[in-house]
Amino acid sequence: MEKAKPYNLEERTAVFAEDVRKFVKRIPRTQANEEDGKQLLKASGSIGANYIEANESLSKKDFYYRCKVCRKESKESAFFLRLIDTGNDESLETERRQLRQEANELKLIFNKMIGTN
């Protein structure tokens, strides 16, 4: 059963970054996965960090800029999740699909916040 998603977006982005970290610890250790995993870790954590910055911004312009960065990092997270090789592990594949869906949902939320589709 899938766990309920936090309503608070700051918490939701933190949970996403935590879930990505747990996932990366479990993937097969290949050279490609090591590199893609590093990029995924950076992008997933950057979503939440930039959202915190957006909430603390001093102007609307800065708020929108930070939300655009969040959207970009969400797209990057989905991209690197796509590249990671889970081997033949069905549970890892299921987890990857769920994480990709969450990255896409975060992207859509930030799209809405900045007023683009």
Where is each model-derived feature located?
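Short, C-terminally biased terminal segments at protein or domain edges
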Residues: 1-53, 57-117
